[in-house]
Every structure is written in C-alpha cells, then in structure tokens.
Amino acid sequence: MATERNRRRKGSYPQLPPAPDDYPTFPDKSTWPVVFPEIPAGTNGRFARPPQHTSKEAAPQIPADQVPQHVAVVMDGNGRWATQRGLGRTEGHKMGEAVLIDITCGAIEIGIKHLTVYAFSTENWKRSTEEVRFLMGFNREVVRRRRENLNDMGVRMRWVGSRPRMWSSVIKEFDIAEQMTVDNDVITINYCVNYGGRTEIVEAARELAQEAVDGKIKPNRISEAQFAKHLHRSDIPDVDLFIRTSGEQRASNFLLWQAAYAEYVFQDKLWPDYDRRDLWAACEEYVQRNRRFGRA
C-alpha cells in the first residue's frame, strides 16, 4: 500500500519514460491474430515494459494525483467498422482484440491502475445465435492467447459478470488467467463478460434480502458500503473516467453503481480504429474536468 501511495504522491509523475528508439512496437495489424512482439524481460524483480506504440509516441506527462485511477471503457463500434468495409460483423470484433492489448499497454505507460472493459453485456444474448456463439468463443480464445503476454507486463486479469448463461469454458480460461496473475500489481484489468449493471445491483439486493430473512442483518442498518460488498467484485474502486468509443453517448447499463461520479468522455472513433493515443487524449481531457462530488 505504501508503494501505491508513493506512486500517486502529489507532484510525482507515474508515466514511463520514452522507450529506446529500437524498443519493440505494437500493434502490427498486417496479420491476424496480431503478433505480440518479444520484449526484454524485466530486471531486478520488475515486470517487462510494454511494447511502445508503432508511432513511438510516449504518454503525456500528468501528475500522479491527476491520473484517473480507474478507467472504464465501452468498446463500441466493431460491427459498424466491419459493415462500412463490406465485412461480416465478426471481423470487427477480431480487429478489436489488438486494440484492447494496445490500450492496456498505454494504460500502463500513463500510470492507470485499474482498467475495466465491456466485452459482452447481458443484453448481447439478444443478438443472432451465430454472433453470440462467436463472441463467447472469441472471449475464451483471447484470454487464452493473451494471458502470458499480459502476465509478463504485470497485469492482473479478472472476470466480472453473472454466472447464469455464461459458458463454463470461458469461466475456466478466466480462472486460469486470474490464478496466473493474482500477484501482479502493475495494473488490474476487469473483463466484463455477461455483465449488466442492473443485474449486478439486483443480484446484490437478493443476497442482502436473504441475509435479512436469515436474521444476519437488520434492513434498517444496510449502508452503501454493505451493499457494495455484495457486488460482483467488491474491491473494484469507483470509476474516475468512463470512455465510450464510436460517437454513441450513453452508459448502456455498464458499471451503474461504480460510475456514479465518473467523468464521461465520448470519442468518435470506432473501436477497431482506436489506440492508446486516444486513451491518453481522454486522460488529458479528464484532467481539465472539475470534479465536485456534489459539493458547490
């Protein structure tokens, strides 16, 4: 905990310095799946530095106390991206994989500690059987394919969502990834698959109601803090910065409890066209906001 306090001390800058010019870059989208480059192993107990962006741009300098600690992202626009190019919708999802890994690298470079991404909502079951089957299998394969790369960079991986209807094979891959990365502390990434904000709140309410019926808790003593303990992951901090791509401007049932006081940044790029520089731009816009939390 002391390390985290020092990292975010006022006046300090948590950004990684510019990478050497010959340091590996990512992503090269000429092939799919996009190949993750071989990066030098970390030294002195440290994790490996992420590959730099292909542009070789470095993260902007933002004081530690102004960097959003928790960033949530609605990765929107995959289907439209594919349709605009005369491709099937699944091709857009495929291209989005590299973007997810790229913004993870960018989040590490700028000093973000928690990243939560919306990969499959409880409403997505309404899509065609073909697309749902693809998305479930795709999430499973992405976790299996990328967990070693993310582990090398000190990423802690976790699944957030509801178990009903969730494919057991997807849960299995997330369980393996979570066990592999449980001690990593560079950044925590929460992958929301079969997630819905209202469902999360209802499930928490059911648990509390049952505790009240069992006499374990008095209804009139239930607090926000007690309620939060029954969310899918009670240790997820409140969202500081909420990003949605593709130009749409709505929350779409994502992190309704955790994002109560988040700053929203809506960006026009479709998700497959997005990269870490867009994430950094959103962080710079966040710095300009005046967060009052109900105060005058």
From Swiss-Prot:
Mg(2+) binds at residues 76, 263. One of its GO terms (molecular function) is ditrans,polycis-undecaprenyl-diphosphate synthase [(2E,6E)-farnesyl-diphosphate specific] activity. Pfam families: Prenyltransf (PF01255). GO terms for cellular component: cytosol; plasma membrane. Keywords: Magnesium, Metal-binding, Transferase. The active site is at residues 76, 124. Substrate binds at residues 77-81, 89, 93, 121-123, 125, 127, 244, 250-252. SUPFAM superfamilies: Undecaprenyl diphosphate synthase. Residues 1-11 have a biased composition (Basic residues). InterPro entries: UPP_synth-like, UPP_synth-like_CS, UPP_synth-like_sf. Residues 1-29 are annotated as: Disordered. Binds 2 magnesium ions per subunit. Its EC number is 2.5.1.-. Its cofactor is Mg(2+). GO terms for biological process: polyprenol biosynthetic process. HAMAP family: ISPT. Catalyzes the condensation of isopentenyl diphosphate (IPP) with allylic pyrophosphates generating different type of terpenoids. Homodimer. Belongs to the UPP synthase family. This is Isoprenyl transferase. It comes from Mycolicibacterium parafortuitum (Mycobacterium parafortuitum). The lineage of its organism: Bacteria, Bacillati, Actinomycetota, Actinomycetes, Mycobacteriales.
